[in-house]
Regions:
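Terminal accessory carbohydrate-recognition/targeting modules of carbohydrate-active enzymes
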Residues: 1-211, 244, 252, 507, ...
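Extended, well-ordered alpha-helical scaffold segments
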Residues: 191-194, 211-218, 265-278, 319-341, ...
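Extended glycan-interaction surfaces of carbohydrate-active proteins
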Residues: 209-247, 272-292, 344-373, 412-493, ...
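Alpha-helical support elements that line or immediately flank enzyme active sites
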Residues: 248-279, 441-453, 498-511, 518
Length: 575
């Protein structure tokens, strides 16, 4: 395996972390909050900055350049350096030569907030307990001397541990109540080599047969570093949306990361797909989101899971077993019945959203007039999901007739009630009043692809072309009076809408337009990184800058584009 460790990353854009860890080193310490110093941040029980890590020289703070690679992080100044590397998911090793470092805890300790610092007589390590995370943070000095301030202090007071500029090395761990004393079973150099090898192997699996680019390796790092081990309510290995403030798994975001994982690791992909289903309630509904210490049911997310599982099977590195298919069938069936039984008004054929959050497009202009609406995207997703359920039923020896009957009824209602002749509209459930049709949301029935009447598909393709900018499909036309450059779903370009639209266009036969959508989105990712969303005019990254569904979508589109290029070259060669 070639050494490709020259991938330089920006600590202000992505955190330093590793697969399986709930920890990271970052300057991002909260919702849109950036600190000057790097902090140790945990995502157990929420996002909590635990320790401020400040380089020191001659008794004063030292301004340093931060150099970040997938396997190491360093603070550098005039030949002096501090380095950090992960030693497993719950520990970091840090060492310095020519620079010291202060590990500082919050100054305030109350009965409910802050940290308590003490020296543990068992092994001589220093321990900080955190009310915010409910965990302990143990610093074990492996080399050099440290100064400790504020040990056993309660109330208000300084609390820090500081290593001097002479060579030093410290292990920093996140613990529960107790653990065996830290034992350095590998040298620092061995840990660096192990982390480098682990990341490169992961990136190679994720990339599969596709050509490697700086974009694919950076996307791989975003996914790798945001992956956490099972803990709390997260019962499977999971890719969080980010190890910045979006540190959850939302019940549609996960689908796009599952697709990215599928070619290299079908087991991880299936776990990612099924994770929200572990918290499916008695009605069949999925939670809005899941994270370490919280499962939210106040909203749901759109039922794209039939579409996603169809794509997942097509991309997976191995066939799914009959038992796995049966599990997916059972979960998808309950999820679909929720929409048909609990989200249709009496006498109505079409299901409804209760709020924009249910659609995933929280504040899209479709919801400006009314919030409780029968929306065309919802019906289209359920039509696909019913198709997938019928196919799974046939493969498993179950009856499929009811699924097909429900599918046909929804398809008739979608075209008969929400298609105006040149566009889809949403409508209020109670009044029947039509909602705005300028949002890209209303064009999402293109996911039905070849199932759409040709004249409907052509109009949707034309609408999508009108949303397309140099960087991808804007969620609101840039010439709309409701367009907002940083308006969340009122203008910016997003990964999920792009992937869904690209897939539908291709299946509907609009290959050239699908190619343009794919190329534009890949271009904006290569230019601006894997942001939560992008300014549709400038291409600048917006909001959370290390968003995994963006990285996952890029990898999916990149792999598909390379596969098409290869197929075209083979076709030319055969002529």
């Amino acid at each position: 395996m070639a050494d490709r460790s020259d991938l330089a990353l920006d600590i202000d854009e992505v955190p330093f972390s590793t697969r399986g860890s709930w920890l990271d080193l970052s300057r991002i310490v909260g919702l849109h909050r950036r600190a000057d110093d790097v902090h140790l941040v945990t995502h157990r029980t929420g996002m909590h900055p635990i320790l401020r890590l400040t380089p020191r020289l001659d008794g004063a703070d030292a301004e340093c350049r931060v150099a970040l690679r997938p396997h190491t992080m360093a603070w550098e100044r005039d030949g002096a350096v501090i380095e950090a590397v992960f030693d497993g998911p719950d520990a970091l090793r840090l060492r310095g030569d020519g620079l010291g470092m202060r590990f500082a805890a919050p100054a305030e300790l109350t009965p409910f907030t802050g940290g308590y610092l003490f020296r543990d007589p068992l092994d001589g390590a220093f321990v900080l307990t955190s009310y915010e995370s409910g965990r302990r943070y143990r610093l074990t000095v492996l080399r050099g001397d440290v100064e400790v301030v504020g040990a056993e202090v309660t109330g208000s007071g300084k609390r820090h541990i500081e290593a001097g500029s002479a060579p030093w090395e410290i292990a920093l761990e996140e613990l529960g109540t107790a653990a065996a004393p830290y034992a350095a079973t590998a040298t620092f150099e061995e840990l660096v080599a192990r982390q480098r090898s682990a990341f490169e192997a992961y990136a190679d699996r994720l990339r599969g047969a596709a050509e490697e680019t700086p974009g694919t390796r950076k996307a791989a790092y975003v996914l790798w570093s945001a992956t956490v081990a099972p803990s709390g309510f997260v019962g499977r290995e999971a890719v969080l949306m980010s190890k910045h403030w979006m540190d959850k798994v939302w019940s549609w975001d996960h689908c796009f990361n599952a697709l990215a994982l599928a070619p290299g690791d079908a087991d991880a992909a299936l776990d990612q797909f099924l994770l929200p289903f572990d918290h499916q309630d008695a009605s069949g509904a999925l939670p809005d989101s899941v994270t370490h210490s919280e499962v939210l049911y106040n909203f749901v997310k759109p039922p794209i899971h039939g579409w996603a599982f169809r794509e997942l099977e097509a991309r997976a590195s191995r066939p799914f077993t009959p038992a796995e298919l049966a599990t997916v069938y059972e979960r998808l069936a309950a999820w679909t019945r929720f929409w048909l039984d609990s989200r249709r008004a009496p006498g109505h054929a079409l299901p409804y959203y209760q709020h924009g959050n249910d659609s995933g497009w929280d504040n899209a202009t479709t919801f400006d007039t009314d919030r409780v609406i029968e929306s065309p995207d919802l019906a289209a997703f359920l039509i696909l999901q019913l198709d997938v359920l019928a196919g799974l039923a046939d493969r498993l020896g179950e009856a499929s007739g009811d699924w097909m009957e429900a599918r046909d009824g929804l398809a008739r209602a979608l075209l008969g009630e929400l298609w105006t002749g040149d566009r889809f509209v949403a409508r209020a459930v109670d009044s029947g009043r039509p909602s705005s049709s300028t949002s890209l949301l209303n064009a999402l029935p293109i996911v039905l692809g070849e199932q759409l009447p040709p004249e409907v598909a052509e109009r949707l393709a034309a609408t999508i072309a009108g949303h397309l900018t140099e960087w991808g499909p804007a969620t609101e036309p840039v010439d709309s009076p409701r367009y907002e450059p940083d308006g969340y779903w009122r203008g910016p370009i997003w990964a999920p809408s792009t992937v869904l639209i690209e897939s539908g266009l291709r299946r509907a036969g609009f290959e050239e337009l699908a190619d343009r959508v794919s190329a534009a989105f890949r271009r904006v990712c290569e230019r601006s990184g894997f942001a939560e969303n992008f300014d549709a005019v400038t291409g600048d990254g917006l909001r959370d800058r290390a968003y995994t569904w963006t990285a996952g979508a890029y990898l999916v589109l990149h792999a598909d584009a390379r596969e098409r290029d290869t197929a075209r070259l083979l076709t030319i060669g055969e002529r």
